[in-house]
Swiss-Prot record:
Transmembrane segments: none annotated. The keyword Cytoplasm applies. The gene is aroA. This is 3-phosphoshikimate 1-carboxyvinyltransferase. The active site is at D324 (proton acceptor).
Length: 439
């Protein structure tokens, strides 16, 4: 798949079947870092095998952490509490879930580190996190444009027990500080409080972070979404083993197939017991008119097939809490019974690409009437006669490729450019897709 320049999708009419989800990217990289900083050995099962987890695994090994591949999505991590390597140059691709948390953790290590990534990573802002870490006493220098990677992290003088961070650009900045805080609290014996400035976006991702920290014995005292305190002497202790649940953001594409293609499509790996906020996308689908059923670790979706004249209900919704899954809603809007609007999606602009611009561009190619602003996008679906054949650019963004696979339910010919970009989170996506759909 990685070698293909493009993939022509056949026109599809139906989708049904069962699909096991790959491991959650958000959980996988958080667990890998926590396990590396914990006392004891952790066996991790269900780990996502993708570009983003590979760069995290490579970075941890460079930092001296012993990681053993046990096969079949299982690894063993020997916790080091502090990274043995005091000097390293790390290449972290376009993995925000690796770059941001490692920046915070390394800032507290007292070593000499350089962090870089692909060109797009060097366009993704990190200034709010760096400002917070500098105020904490860290020494961090920009190696290019101020406010953006690459970074040089040196030996700082961590003294403050209260840190403030902006919450309006990316919740990963708060996650990074939370994951790193036990390093300092455990070393100093003093509690560390992290204050959030402004409105915190993507709150469900913070819930994932707090849940995983608790599994490793660090319970965070909260003052709503404004302040988070890690007690003095806090330290991560391995639970011995931990299972990574399926990726709820990835589930959105497969569930959407079930809705648009009649279904049912059932995904396994997430369900009523999931800790991921993107499972709420099932409620979004229900509001569109889909039939949704759930179990402890599965979700099933069906609907009225659009190839038979079915249409989803038009929507005007705030997607602040589920920005990744919201991309699926944007392409589903091609099959709505009226104009649709996605609000509060400003975080799209600093993701793997400027997703508002990319979505606007590619949806318009198919014949939709699209408008967008700083944090919103609206779409009027094309009439059947207005659909246009399109070569869909994926903008080196895995989610663009997966979202636009849904366009094959329409009457136009769809070509996905650079389909291999799905390797960031779901290398086998188009194989799984082919197993669910039919003409």
């Amino acid at each position: 798949m990685n070698a293909l320049a493009y993939l022509d999708l056949p026109h599809i009419r139906q989708a049904r079947g069962l699909a096991a989800l790959p491991g959650s990217k958000s959980i996988s990289n958080r667990v890998l870092l926590i396990a590396a900083l914990a006392e004891g050995r952790t066996e991790i099962s269900g780990l996502l095998d993708s570009d983003d987890t590979r760069v995290m695994l490579a970075a941890l090994r460079q930092l001296g952490v012993a990681v053993t591949d046990l096969g079949q999505g299982r690894v063993a991590v020997e916790g080091a509490r502090r990274f043995p390597a005091e000097k390293a140059e790390l290449f972290l691709g376009n993995a925000g879930t690796a770059f941001r948390p490692l920046t915070a953790a390394l800032a507290l290590m007292g070593g000499d580190y350089r962090l870089s990534g692909v060109p797009r990573m060097h366009e993704r802002p990190i200034g709010d996190l760096v400002d917070a870490l500098r105020a904490w006493g860290a020494r961090i220098d920009y190696l290019g444009q101020a406010g953006y990677p690459p970074l040089h992290i040196g030996r700082g003088d961590i003294r403050a027990d209260r840190v403030r961070v902006q919450g309006s650009v990316s919740s990963q900045f708060l996650t990074a500080l939370l994951l790193a805080a036990p390093i300092e609290a455990g070393a100093s014996g003093r509690p560390v409080t992290i204050e959030v400035i402004g409105e915190l976006i993507s709150k469900p991702y913070i819930e994932i972070t707090l849940n995983l920290m608790a599994r490793y014995g660090v319970n965070v005292v909260r003052d709503g979404w404004r302040a988070f305190t890690i007690e003095g002497d806090a330290r991560y202790r391995s639970p011995g083993s931990i299972a990574v649940e399926g990726d709820a953001s990835t589930a959105s594409y497969l569930l959407a197939l079930g809705v648009l293609g009649g279904g049912p499509v059932r995904v396994t790996g997430v369900g009523e017991q999931s800790i991921q906020g993107d499972t709420a996308f099932a409620d979004t689908l229900a509001a569109m008119g889909a039939n949704i059923t759930k179990g402890s670790d599965w979700i099933e979706a069906s609907g009225q097939a659009v190839a038979e004249g079915g249409r989803i209900k038009a929507f005007d919704a705030d997607f602040n809490l589920i920005p990744d899954a919201a991309m699926t809603a944007a392409t589903m809007a091609l099959f709505a019974d009226g104009p649709c609007r996605l609000r509060n999606i400003g975080s799209w602009r600093v993701k793997e690409t400027d997703r508002i611009h990319a979505m606007h561009t590619e949806l318009a190619k198919l014949g939709a009437k699209v408008e967008s602003g700083p944090d919103w996008l609206s779409l009027t679906p094309p009439a059947d006669s207005d659909w246009r054949d399109a070569h869909i650019g994926t903008w080196d963004d895995h989610r663009m490729a997966m979202c636009f696979s849904l366009a094959a339910f329409g009457p136009a010919a769809v070509r996905i450019l650079d389909p291999g970009c799905v390797s960031k989170t779901f290398p086998d996506y188009f194989d799984v897709y082919a197993g669910l759909v039919s003409a």
